Amino acid sequence: MKTMKTWRIILAMTAAVLSLASCSSDPEYADPEAHEKTVALNEQYAPLMIGTWHYEKTGDTQRYFEELTFRADGTLTGTRKWQVRKLVTIGGEQQYTDWEDLDPLVGAFTGEWKLSYWSPEGQDGQKRNVLQLTASYDDGEYMAYSTNVDFGYADATTLRIQGLYVRDADGWINFERGEAEPSF
C-alpha cells in the first residue's frame, strides 16, 4: 500500500512539474541561418515570380520552348514544346531529318514551386538559392519537373534560373516575362 501511495505522489509531482514547464509556440529550426535566408529570399523575389514567363532556344538540331506560370499559392502550370532532328548523310550529301517532338517531354503540366536557401546535396553541399519545382504532365504518366535548380534572380522582365534540359552558353536560362507562343 505504501508503494502505491509513493507512486501516486511521484506521478502527481511529475504532472505538476510538466504542467508548469514553459512551452514555446515558436518553432526551433534545425538551421536558423537557412530559415532566415529563405524568408528573405521569398520576401525579395516571390512577388516578382508571380506571373507567366517564357523561354525559347532554337539551334540546328534542337528547338525548345517553355512557358511557366507561377501563382502566389505555390502552384505552377506550364507547357513545353521540344523538337529535335538529326544531320544525316544520304547519297554522299548531308541533310537534316524532319523535326520530331521529343516525346514524352512535351505538353502541358501542373505542379508546385518554392524558393529556398539550402543545399540540395545535403550536409556536405554548398547552400545556395534554389527554385524547387515539382510538376507532372497533365496525362499523369511523366514528371515535367522533380528538381531543384539554382535561382539567380527575378525582376520586372527576367527570371534567371540554372538550365536543366536546355541552357544558354553560360549554363543559365533567362525567361522573359509574359505569355508567348513558340515560333516553330
Enumerate the language-model features and the residues they cover.
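Bacterial N-terminal signal peptides that target proteins for export
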Residues: 2-11
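N-terminal helix-cap/turn-to-beta initiation motif at the start of protein domains
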Residues: 32-54, 69
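Short, low-complexity, Pro/Ser/Thr/Gly-rich segments in the mature regions of secreted, periplasmic
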Residues: 170-184
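Contiguous, well-ordered beta-strand patches that form the walls/edges
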Residues: 58-63, 81-160, 167
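C-terminal motif of bacterial Sec signal peptides marking the signal peptidase cleavage site
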Residues: 19-22
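Bacterial signal peptide processing site
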Residues: 24-27
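Structural signal for glycine-centered tight turns and loop->strand junctions in beta-sheet-rich domains
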Residues: 72-76
